[in-house]
Amino acid sequence: MSELSLQDVAVSYGRRVAVEPFSDTIAPGEWVGLIGPNGAGKSSLLRSIAGLVRHAGSIEVDGTRLGDLKDRERAQRVAYVPQEPLIPDDMTVTDYVLLGRTPYIGYWSSESKHDRDVVADTLERLRLGEFAPRLLGALSGGERQRVVLARALAQEAPILLLDEP
């Protein structure tokens, strides 16, 4: 568990302000829900924490500024499940969830026994073990949602962001 600190985080797309300056500290183990109407900036805030959107202000995990980290280091601290994940139909469930262990090209080693064990355990916890060898394109919508969640959980990041999963 880690502390997440947001200091004057703001997001804009051109002249359109998506997130007004926002500050908060979320303690280890605390659960927080962002509630608001469409266009209120909930997804933009989550995407900025995940490092997918440029933002003003500071985002820190346990005192470390996320903006100072390389993508790989950030992924070890923050896992993100987007509203509409890209799911390749021709990849197996196991290989897709393995990407959560090593989410950036150049770091993926499907030969790691530890990574494969974590993926197998994660799939079992979500009752997806029997789906491991299947292609993602053969799964139902609900099964695919659970696989996307498994990928994020397999990262074993202390912070998990769920954008309307």
Ranges and model annotations:
Residues 110, 135-139, 143:
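Conserved ABC ATPase signature
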